[in-house]
Amino acid sequence: MLSESSSFLKGVMLGSIFCALITMLGHIRIGNRMHHHEHHHLQAPNKDDISKISEAERMELSKSFRVYCIVLVKPKDVSLWAAVKETWTKHCDKAEFFSSENVKVFESINMDTNDMWLMMRKAYKYAYDQYRDQYNWFFLARPTTFAVIENLKYFLLKKDQSQPFYLGHTVKSGDLEYVSVDGGIVLSIESMKRLNSLLSVPEKCPEQGGMIWKISEDKQLAVCLKYAGVFAENAEDADGKDVFNTKSVGLFIKEAMTNQPNQVVEGCCSDMAVTFNGLTPNQMHVMMYGVYRLRAFGHVFNDALVFLPPNGSEND
């Protein structure tokens, strides 16, 4: 039999959960009704799609397809910050770091807040105000994330940036479907436009979460985008495997060795993966070597379309 004190604590916990749910529903409600939307499973183009593109179109795509990268950092992330700066962000058409405070070691844009949601919304507003006429797609990541930007561009190849895309690794929390920031978040310029129009409307996109329960920044973003008619969509390859990953390659391989010991490499993850998360600085450099430097003699990949790294990139 539970003691009176434990019964009291149980009641407090249940009451808190109830209040949290009410707060969450209040955020997601649009007008006087709820919008019901099952997220789509968007796939990368196949080789046949690419083969149908003319040589002139391929050249134009390789030059005009532009991705702006946003990395949210804090001073405690300085070693990860250095690794990200020296590795995959060099393949973004432009990458900028948004920090919680001024950091002398690396150049960054000071958001002057430790709150991750405030940092995220300020970074999105800055990116839209500064670069809305220069970039088609906006990719946001943590400093623990490694991204293969060429694979991101390939995945987005047949997607229309004038449509409201909100892509990545989707997660469902109650009635809310959102893209996990751990795997990286991709917004089209149209989604950025819609989000920007709501950032100054606190009733639909508040700077803070509920008074009782604060939700994570990626969930808060989904709430704001839902008001704008933009919904989370899961990104997959032609085999249905996720291309935005919230875990590291090492963890995927460990799981595959347990669950699919005869198909560790094939069962691990997509060979067109865009992101992995939870990496150390050392693992960032290992990934960079494996993705861009290591070659198996005799194995040649004749890709029909090549996305060239931006001018000034030291990586090939």
Swiss-Prot record:
Keywords: Chaperone, Membrane, Signal-anchor, Transmembrane, Transmembrane helix. It is a single-pass type II membrane protein. It comes from Mus musculus (Mouse). It is found in: Membrane. InterPro entries: C1GALT1/C1GALT1_chp1. Gene3D superfamilies: 3.90.550.50. Signal peptide: none annotated. Its main location: membrane. Belongs to the glycosyltransferase 31 family. Beta3-Gal-T subfamily. One of its GO terms (biological process) is platelet morphogenesis. It comes from the Eukaryota. The keyword Transferase does not apply. Associates with core 1 beta-3-galactosyltransferase (C1GALT1), probably not with the soluble active form. Probable chaperone required for the generation of 1 O-glycan Gal-beta1-3GalNAc-alpha1-Ser/Thr (T antigen), which is a precursor for many extended O-glycans in glycoproteins. Probably acts as a specific molecular chaperone assisting the folding/stability of core 1 beta-3-galactosyltransferase (C1GALT1). Residues 27-316 are lumenal. Residues 1-6 are cytoplasmic. This is C1GALT1-specific chaperone 1. The chain crosses the membrane at residues 7-26. GO terms for cellular component: membrane.
